[in-house]
UniProtKB/Swiss-Prot annotation:
UniProt KW keywords: Cell inner membrane, Cell membrane, Membrane, Peptide transport, Protein transport, Transmembrane, Transmembrane helix, Transport
Cytoplasmic side stretches: 1-38, 124-137, 184-213, 291-302
Protein name: Oligopeptide transport system permease protein OppC
Transmembrane regions listed in the UniProt entry: 39-59, 103-123, 138-160, 164-183, 214-234, 270-290
Organism: Escherichia coli (strain K12)
Annotated S-S bridges: none
Subunit structure as annotated in this protein's UniProt entry: The complex is composed of two ATP-binding proteins (OppD and OppF), two transmembrane proteins (OppB and OppC) and a solute-binding protein (OppA or MppA).
Biological-process GO terms, alphabetical: oligopeptide import across plasma membrane; peptidoglycan-associated peptide transport; protein transport; tripeptide import across plasma membrane
Role description: Part of the ABC transporter complex OppABCDF involved in the uptake of oligopeptides and of the ABC transporter complex MppA-OppBCDF involved in the uptake of the cell wall murein tripeptide L-alanyl-gamma-D-glutamyl-meso-diaminopimelate. Probably responsible for the translocation of the substrate across the membrane. Plays an important nutritional role and is involved in the recycling of cell wall peptides.
Membrane topology, Periplasmic segments: 60-102, 161-163, 235-269
Gene3D superfamilies, per database record: MetI-like
A Pfam family assignment: BPD_transp_1
Keyword Transmembrane in annotation: yes
Length: 302
């Protein structure tokens, strides 16, 4: 009986090992991510927030720039249809929070996409080529990283005025710098692997090695960093808008709404609470998802 129990345990462990070995990296990562309750709950909440910012302006009877002269600085009210209340100009806060969420999320996701594309290609090329080329590319990266970014944004706003496109350009210019440095470090360790040497011996071009062999092997790190980059970029855009360097009226972002709400929080606290609540919850969701992806893709846990 004891022997049978040991045999069954051995067979069970062996089958579990075969099951793990039979799964790919991404299948195993997905399984472990789905077991992370905080990450899954955050993903669900984030999807609900995304649906809200997309659908709320379409379903609402008010536009983001409509003025209700009879309901200026009105508290949240179910009967009037202003569920989040109105601002000092009589504009519906629910719609403005949704429109602001669209812009804030677009800025965060766009910055992450720029970081993924530009940073991954730049870092992998720099690390793979090495030598003087790597030194020159890294010095250029350090120069860009040391540039006073706030001064650059103020300069853009002074010459071209407040424009959401300028925010995309300004944030996109700095979002990829850290990504490139991280990918370069990963590439330096990958370029000594046997499969890279085999590709070199087989006559595969530099671009082919980078795109087909190096980039797929750094995607785990890239995905994790990109998921953690989105909330930092949203927060940075909110900071710019809070200072008055972001979106221009009548458009808004969560940062601009926070700035407006902070000026009247004593008499109209809902103007601060609703955009602040959405911003905080979104940032927490992205950070929990990033932590979940990091744990799921960590090779030490495989």
């Amino acid at each position: 009986m004891m022997l049978s129990k040991k045999n069954s345990e051995t067979l069970e462990n062996f089958s579990e090992k075969l099951e793990v070995e039979g799964r790919s990296l991404w299948q195993d990562a997905r399984r472990r991510f789905m077991h992370n309750r905080a990450a899954v709950a955050s993903l669900i909440v984030l999807v609900l927030i995304a649906l809200f910012v997309i659908l709320a302006p379409m379903l609402s009877q008010f536009a983001y720039d409509d003025t209700d002269w009879a309901m200026m600085s009105s508290a949240p009210d179910m009967e009037s249809g202003h569920y989040f209340g109105t601002d000092s100009s009589g504009r519906d806060l629910l719609v403005r929070v949704a429109i602001g969420g669209r812009i804030s999320l677009m800025v965060g996701v766009a910055a992450a996409l720029v970081a993924v594309v530009v940073g991954t290609l730049y870092g992998s090329l720099s690390g793979y080529l090495g030598g003087k080329v790597d030194s020159v590319m890294m010095r250029l990266l350090e120069i860009l990283n040391s540039f006073p970014f706030m001064f650059f944004v103020i300069l853009l706003v002074t010459f071209f005025g407040q424009n959401i496109l300028l925010i995309f350009v300004a944030i996109g210019m700095v979002s990829w710098l850290d990504m490139a440095r991280i990918v370069r470090g990963q590439t330096l360790s990958l370029k000594r692997k046997e499969f890279i040497e085999a590709a070199q011996v087989g006559g595969v071009s530099t671009s082919g090695i980078v795109i087909r062999h190096i980039v797929p092997n750094v995607l785990g790190v890239v995905v994790v960093y990109a998921s953690l980059l989105v909330p930092s970029m949203i927060l940075f855009e909110s900071f710019l808008s809070f200072l008055g360097l972001g979106t221009q009226e009548p458009l808004s972002s969560w940062g601009a709404l926070l700035s407006d709400g902070a000026n009247s929080m004593e008499v109209s606290p809902w103007l601060l609470l609703f955009p602040a609540g959405f911003l905080v919850v979104t940032l927490f969701c992205f950070n929990f998802i990033g932590d979940g992806l990091r744990d799921a893709l960590d090779p030490k846990d495989r």
